[in-house]
Amino acid sequence: MGQCCTGGGKAVAGDEAEPGTSKAAPPSRGTSSKNGSAKQQPCSPAAKAAATEAAAAASSSKKPAGPIGEVLERPMEEVRTTYSIGKELGRGQFGVTHLCTHKATGEKLACKTIAKRKLANKEDVDDVRREVQIMHHLSGQPNIVDLRGAYEDKHNVHLVMELCAGGELFDRIIARGHYTERAAAALLRAIVGIVHTCHSMGVIHRDLKPENFLLLSKGDDAPLKATDFGLSVFFKEGEVFRDIVGSAYYIAPEVLKRKYGPEADIWSIGVMLYIFLAGVPPFWAESENAIFTAILRGQIDLASEPWPKISSGAKDLVRKMLNINPKERLTAFQVLNHPWIKEDGDAPDVPLDNVVLNRLKQFRAMNQFKKAALRIIAGCLSEEEIKGLKEMFKNIDKDNSGTITLEELKNGLAKQGTKFSDNEIEQLMEAADADGNGIIDYEEFVTATVHMNKMDREEHLYTAFQYFDKDNSGYITKEELEQALKEQGLYDANEIKDVITDADSNNDGRIDYSEFVAMMRKGSGCAEATNPKKKRRDLVL
């Protein structure tokens, strides 16, 4: 939504760690004293975050403690006791974000509300709990969104955090109208500094992209804030993660191979640097699978326009950040010490070709269109549909083992009358079977089939198309797109022409249904085609 320091709904990221390692226990980087003793004991970031939460809960109210909440595992408390809730800022299937005001101070903040009924299993609950722990752990860092409080009542979990009124990172680039390598270096320096902080505190973000960096205000000197820690995890040095999470253009090759660590964040920032300098992603294709294939090849184009005009220092840094071998890739600290990125470094203060700025405008505009469409699709997924998938699993799992094989899945889906092709079922099994043992369990099945059977189905794409096609003419016109984006709070008059131009393959000045579907499926913004544990907070924009 680009207006508050929050990514919206809750993300799912389960079974990330290599067997035998701690899923949410980072390296012991801090100390704590026991009963005032001078003796220091190791304290992990997760433990410190939990302690911070407990302290916040203990000091937030003088009233008698309420019943313990099953999500945050501390006394439940009404968020409206402290904050007044204002206008809606964004909505999706799994939650809604409102403007809120602190009653005592008048401070304007953002309140993200997650409906507890949407937390379908223990993994979902653990993910919300971990997101809160990580945000508490990172609290106080100047360029990371500040979580002011986490509240739980009978029906919801509420996360109150800073309001970022300055828009997205792309907004700053585009608004200035001119752009230099030195400006790109300054942006990258801020971003890498944030990631260096996260890594030094034992946190991998796992979803770094321009949309997750917001400006605190509209001022020229407004600080950049990293947001959306819904996919983030605590890590220990040497720990290996296996979940495929992130956004398609920015996913590192080792993530696709299900064996990665903090180096994956550096790859994502390298992709961002490429986009800052060229205006397009380095790995571009007509479908997610083709994008992933290109990523795995790791061949980057530094010869086409505008690269001949880009400095050798910038190209050197791009190569070193997009090294396909994570062991040879630069660390955040090494990036910050590269000659091109330093404050008085080698990045020239010469305007980049206008084509770069125009490409950035078009790239951002299409993201906004897709955001609006995904929001409509999210509304198509009812709680009843999800419950139906749970019942489907029970019927397929005849021996009540809690797992099903590929053949059981094929037979069970056929008996259920669900129209999956063999290829879809095989993709489903491959994506969901994280440990490669040939079976999927209940939670994997539900999260995977929600995507395969709901998110990308024709009827939901058509529903989204109809939302934009206000007069039911079979076409989305410039005026209809303007109206729809205004309704979604994503409107920018300067971007509408770029959106139409990019999607309108037959150049008739409007978007028909086939062009709309092609646009939605071309280089989709999230890794759902391969990731059964879909990024739920992408649907709350």
Curated annotation (Swiss-Prot):
Active site: residue positions: 207
Membrane topology: Lipid-anchor
GO CC annotation: cytoplasm; membrane; nucleus
Species the sequence originates in: Oryza sativa subsp. japonica
Residues that, per the record, bind Ca(2+) 2: 433, 435, 437, 444
Keywords: ATP-binding, Calcium, Kinase, Lipoprotein, Membrane, Metal-binding, Myristate, Nucleotide-binding, Repeat, Serine/threonine-protein kinase, Transferase
EC code: 2.7.11.1
Positions of Ca(2+) 4 binding: 504, 506, 508, 510, 515
Lineage, highest ranks first: Eukaryota, Viridiplantae, Streptophyta, Embryophyta, Tracheophyta
Family membership noted in the UniProt record: Belongs to the protein kinase superfamily. Ser/Thr protein kinase family. CDPK subfamily.
Name assigned to this protein: Calcium-dependent protein kinase 25
Record text on activity regulation: Activated by calcium. Autophosphorylation may play an important role in the regulation of the kinase activity.
Domain comment as written in the entry: There are 3 contiguous domains conserved in the CDPK subfamily: a kinase domain, an autoinhibitory (junction) domain and a calmodulin-like domain. The autoinhibitory domain (347-377) inactivates kinase activity under calcium-free conditions.
Highest rank taxon of the organism: Eukaryota
Tissue: Specifically expressed in heading panicles, spikelets and mature pollen grains. Not expressed in vegetative tissues.
Record-linked InterPro entries: CDPK_Ser/Thr_kinases, EF-hand-dom_pair, EF_Hand_1_Ca_BS, EF_hand_dom, Kinase-like_dom_sf, Prot_kinase_dom, Protein_kinase_ATP_BS, Ser/Thr_kinase_AS
Bias (Low complexity) ranges: 38-67
Binding site for Ca(2+) 1: 397, 399, 401, 403, 408
A GO MF label: ATP binding
Enzyme class: transferase
Role: May play a role in signal transduction pathways that involve calcium as a second messenger.
Chain residues that bind Ca(2+) 3: 469, 471, 473, 475, 480
Catalytic activity reported: L-seryl-[protein] + ATP = O-phospho-L-seryl-[protein] + ADP + H(+); L-threonyl-[protein] + ATP = O-phospho-L-threonyl-[protein] + ADP + H(+)
SMART domains in the cross-refs: EFh, S_TKc
Gene: CPK25
Lipid moiety-binding residues (N-myristoyl glycine): 2
PANTHER family xrefs: SERINE/THREONINE-PROTEIN KINASE (PTHR24349)
